[in-house]
Amino acid sequence: SAGKFIVIFKNGVSDDKIRETKDEVIAEGGTITNEYNMPGMKGFAGELTPQSLTKFQGLQGDLIDSIEEDGIVTTQ
């Protein structure tokens, strides 16, 4: 896998589109480990394959608000 990422959708993306996107992650061999469904923040955490990651990077600004690597953030 490309690694663990948190994918946040833009406001106004339909639940159907979000479900479809998560299904694609699984179909491509990735996993969904957590889902976020709060007012103003919908998305998921999971392990993405390199092809899913590339596809999502192409959707940024359109469907996806942000993609962040899911890891422990350390500050120096």
From Swiss-Prot:
Family, as annotated: Belongs to the protease inhibitor I9 family.
Gene3D superfamilies hit by this protein: Peptidase S8 propeptide/proteinase inhibitor I9 (3.30.70.80)
Functional summary from the UniProt entry: Specifically inhibits an intracellular serine proteinase (proteinase A).
Keywords: Acetylation, Protease inhibitor, Serine protease inhibitor
Presence of the UniProt keyword Acetylation in the record: yes
Acetylation is among the record's keywords: yes
Organism superkingdom: Eukaryota
GO annotation (BP), single: vacuole fusion, non-autophagic
Organism name: Pleurotus ostreatus (Oyster mushroom)
UniProt modified residues of type N-acetylserine: 1
Full protein name: Serine proteinase inhibitor IA-2
GO molecular function, one term: serine-type endopeptidase inhibitor activity
